[in-house]
UniProtKB/Swiss-Prot annotation:
Pfam families from the UniProt entry: STAS
GO terms (BP aspect): sporulation resulting in formation of a cellular spore
A GO molecular-function descriptor: anti-sigma factor antagonist activity
Signal peptide: none
PTM sites of type Phosphoserine: 58
Residue ranges of coiled coil: none
Family statement: Belongs to the anti-sigma-factor antagonist family.
Protein name, per record: Anti-sigma F factor antagonist
Gene transcribed to yield this protein: spoIIAA
Upper taxonomic lineage: Bacteria, Bacillati, Bacillota, Bacilli, Bacillales
Gene3D superfamilies, alphabetized: STAS domain
UniProt-listed SUPFAM superfamilies: SpoIIaa-like
Domain of life, per lineage: Bacteria
Length: 117
């Protein structure tokens, strides 16, 4: 299975919706797309909606961590939302939730960042 990437900007937030599998075959594509948006637009925060992401491996975790570091350097925050149980377990085991906030929905994540829907 491949990775579907839907990226849109809402005020100063880069909203990323992923579907399918984020693994070593697809991680570089996501990295390039997100980094390109961060370079070209006035983005302060990232919301990553993982509701339809069925699989993630360590390469996917690396991409998430790398984008977290990028947005932190810009003074922003990353929020992961609507995460599936399997992917949530991977985040839990990796310790990423110690630095990246988890919200139940994209709507709630945007509200947390002060962006109206």
């Amino acid at each position: 299975m491949s990775l579907g990437i839907d990226i849109h900007v809402k005020e100063s937030v880069l909203c990323i919706r992923l579907t399918g599998e984020l693994d070593h075959h697809t991680a570089e594509t996501l990295r390039k797309q997100v980094s390109g948006h961060l370079e070209q637009t006035d983005i302060r925060h990232i919301v990553m909606n993982l509701a339809d992401l069925s699989f993630m491996d360590s390469s996917g975790l690396g991409v998430v961590l790398g984008r977290y570091k990028e947005i932190k350097q810009l003074g922003g925050e990353m929020i992961v939302c609507a995460i599936s149980p399997a992917v949530k377990r991977l985040f839990d085991m990796s310790g990423l939730f110690k630095i990246i906030r988890l919200e139940q929905s994209e709507q709630r994540a945007l509200e947390t960042l002060g962006v109206a829907s």
